[in-house]
Amino acid sequence: MWIGIISLFPEMFRAITDYGVTGRAVKNGLLSIQSWSPRDFTYDRHRTVDDRPYGGGPGMLMMVQPLRDAIHAAKAAAGEGAKVIYLSPQGRKLDQAGVSELATNQKLILVCGRYEGIDERVIQTEIDEEWSIGDYVLSGGELPAMTLIDSVSRFIPGVLGHEASATEDSFAEGLLDCPHYTRPEVLEGMEVPPVLLSGNHAEIRRWRLKQSLGRTWLRRPELLENLALTEEQARLLAEFKTEHAQQQHKHDGMA
């Protein structure tokens, strides 16, 4: 996958290119990241990249000419088929379904805004889609862009050490992930669930699915509203609810 970055602070993306899963992907040639700074497309002595908004008001906007020139340079480098994305609070909220959708693109150009944003006409003429990582304000689009890159790169074949990892992540099937345990078997009196030590892969799969369903019901019940549960999933969720109610009753009786 090839990803182009438009940012006033391209050095921030060393967190993606130099470390962790994405860093290994870059090193192994599975992910290619290039960046363009609008500041490199300025022609004045101060390398100005901001401008006052029409109509007044606080704050500045990114200057149109350097931004457009940077986008055009990225498009030229990408060639045909690159999707241009603007990271914006007004965009579609990124979720696992959206990540999976974006991962089908071989080329992405991510435009990171600064100041109060960018000229609406640049959005209309240069941007294919707007995406947001949540209903809150950040200082720029770099962190959302890094979030998008990290999540999308997990779908690139060969990036993860275990090919099943991406499909077993939280939200991969619309559910939260199940609890995980490693050594020691007993930690401050808390034991690993016996089923995970049993070696019975069918029962382990069933336990993990039940816990995934139950955790989603407890923490993000709205996610279940969008799912058509299979007969097995519905049965396991009912079992979890019964067990949870029994545990709560026992806890209340001890209080």
Curated annotation (Swiss-Prot):
Gene Ontology molecular function terms on file: tRNA (guanine(37)-N1)-methyltransferase activity
Functional summary from the UniProt entry: Specifically methylates guanosine-37 in various tRNAs.
Gene3D superfamilies: 3.40.1280.10, tRNA(m1g37)methyltransferase, domain 2
Highest taxon above the source species: Bacteria
Annotated InterPro entries: Alpha/beta_knot_MTases (IPR029028), tRNA_m1G_MeTrfase_C_sf (IPR023148), tRNA_m1G_MeTrfase_TrmD (IPR002649), tRNA_m1G_MTases_N (IPR029026), tRNA_MeTrfase_TRMD/TRM10 (IPR016009)
Catalytic reaction(s) noted: guanosine(37) in tRNA + S-adenosyl-L-methionine = N(1)-methylguanosine(37) in tRNA + S-adenosyl-L-homocysteine + H(+)
This enzyme's EC code(s): 2.1.1.228
Coiled coil: none
Keywords on record: Cytoplasm, Methyltransferase, S-adenosyl-L-methionine, Transferase, tRNA processing
Protein name (Swiss-Prot/TrEMBL): tRNA (guanine-N(1)-)-methyltransferase
PANTHER family the UniProt entry points to: TRNA (GUANINE-N(1)-)-METHYLTRANSFERASE
Gene Ontology CC terms, in alphabetical order: cytosol
Species: Escherichia coli O127:H6 (strain E2348/69 / EPEC)
Chief location bin: cytoplasm
GO annotation, biological process: tRNA N1-guanine methylation
UniProt keyword Nucleus, yes or no: no
Subunit structure: Homodimer.
Compartments reported by the entry: Cytoplasm
Positions annotated to bind S-adenosyl-L-methionine: 113, 133-138
Family of this protein: Belongs to the RNA methyltransferase TrmD family.
Pfam families from the UniProt entry: tRNA_m1G_MT
